[in-house]
Amino acid sequence: MSTDFDRIFMNQSKFGGRFRIADSGLGWKVSTSGGSASAQNKAPFLLPATELSTVQWSRGCRGFELKINTKNQGVIQLEGFSEDDFNIIKGDFHRRFSIQVEHKEHSLRGWNWGQTDLARNEMVFALNGKPVFEIPYARINNTNLTAKNEVAVEFNIQDDTYQPAGDEMVEMRFYLPGSVVVDEDQPAPKKEGEEEGEEAAETETKSLAEAFYEELKNKADIGEIAGDAIVSFQDVFFTTPRGRYDIDIYENSIRLRGKTYEYKLQHNQIQRIVSLPKADDINHLVVLAMDPPLRQGQTTYPFLVLQFQKDEETEVQLNLSDQEYEEKYKDKLKKQYDSKTHIVISHVLKGLTGRRVVVPGEYKSKYEQCAVSCSYKANEGYLYPLDNAFFFLTKPTLYIPFNDVSSVVISRAGQTSTSSRTFDLEVILRSNRGSTIFGNISKEEQQLLENFLKSKNLRVKNEEKDAQVRLQSALGSDSDDEDVNMGSAGEDDESVDEDFHVSSGDDDDEVAEEFDSEAASEGEDEDEDMDGSDRPTKKPKTE
């Protein structure tokens, strides 16, 4: 006869389920009345009785929690119990499995310092003998020694079996001052000339943070053995994050080992693999698009950029038995590679991640290259118009799919003689998500680039051509204005009044003399004019 408990949450899951204790072991299955269809169809979790190691009872986030330490499957957390369930669970475990349920109380002081204990399946942070919190090793993705006395622990948020409700913590840092003696249990080697029984005056020491970092790596199985890697590449140059790393590729993960930092990547983090020749015709780039991005403290790297010499070749053999290769990797990988390095690593990543490799498409610049030189903000780089996206390298790396592009605007950079040799390419995104401007592109590339974008059914607007069309239409309208028929208004302006007769000059003089006694005759007017500007000036008298 089994014992069942409803509304129990496993490993902080979003949805509750039914927990069962039977003679054969433990089981949990998500409730049929809650969760998505995929969650409901998920197979129940079963734990054989032979896997049980220790069991603890404590207060949790949702009522009371039952923590089960297993022999080979890590830690199982079940919460949602009531306080009255303790006696039932305690009796069941003792009767069925001969295991005592230990009652644990957590420290609620709220202090941020204490002691660390690296137990069998989890790291325990305790204060005065009471646990403050526990971190299962299965939840730790990576750890780095970020400073002399500081260790950063990164958590795995790509585990499909772990789907907690709400926000997740992605990193925690521990400050460990002090130092420890290395191999203090073993006698130090005697120096030359040192007498028997005389101890060495100096002993090798290391920081406490470094010792904790190395022990945590071993306990959490973060640093896999290099011999277990399917294939390894030594001293590969990365432009992002900058440095040289040894790459160990495993069945489900990738390990990057540098002089200062180490990174662990899950295969399902790699969303895209792009292989592009660099414009200098010397190097070749392989870009890995990551989601979620690689983290180094507060810095995130959504793209990893590997650089190889174009003609560099490598010869590697997969670290797999013939049987394992035939069963798992025959259709994905080659048993042995002897080719250019960037081709080998691209093919291996493609086979293990299931992502296709994106390569340059139809576009060719005036100089038969697949990229054009340009600038993005204050950074210079190269824009690669691929068959379905824009790709800008190298810093920052930008990937803009054509599906996200609303239109492309080609505009001149300025009116001076220098800037008229270049133009700007503005990529406007859909749904009012802003735009990205690539500037200082050579004018020689404009027509080729414009034709390529139009062939991809993108809306291309050329501001320079539009301005010329507007100017021509404006000039055409001005010439048409001369022939416009103004109607009766025009005739009134040009008509002659037949009743009006212009009198001669003599009549004018007579009228002026009759009504104005000071009116001057024509001859007098001429004399007055001569007195003015028409009269020659006298030469100055010289003594």
UniProtKB/Swiss-Prot annotation:
Biased composition range(s): Basic and acidic residues: 532-543
Keywords in alphabetical order: Chromosome, DNA damage, DNA repair, DNA replication, Nucleus, Transcription, Transcription regulation
GO CC annotations, alphabetized: chromosome, telomeric region; FACT complex
Region (Disordered): 183-204, 472-543
Keyword Transcription regulation: yes
MF (Gene Ontology): DNA binding; histone binding; nucleosome binding
Compartmental location: Nucleus; Chromosome
Superkingdom assignment: Eukaryota
Family annotation (InterPro entries): PH-like_dom_sf, RTT106/SPT16-like_middle_dom, RTT106/SSRP1_HistChap/FACT, SSRP1-like_PH1, SSRP1/POB3, SSRP1/POB3_N, SSRP1_DD, SSRP1_sf
Bias type Acidic residues, positions: 478-497, 505-531
Miscellaneous comment in the UniProt entry for this protein: In contrast to the orthologous protein in animals and plants, this protein does not contain a HMG box DNA-binding domain. This function may instead be provided by the HMG box of the associated NHP6 protein in the FACT complex of fungi.
Subunit and partners: Forms a stable heterodimer with SPT16. The SPT16-POB3 dimer weakly associates with multiple molecules of NHP6 to form the FACT complex.
Similarity-based family: Belongs to the SSRP1 family.
Function comment: Component of the FACT complex, a general chromatin factor that acts to reorganize nucleosomes. The FACT complex is involved in multiple processes that require DNA as a template such as mRNA elongation, DNA replication and DNA repair. During transcription elongation the FACT complex acts as a histone chaperone that both destabilizes and restores nucleosomal structure.
Protein name as annotated: FACT complex subunit POB3
Upper lineage: Eukaryota, Fungi, Dikarya, Ascomycota, Saccharomycotina
Gene: POB3
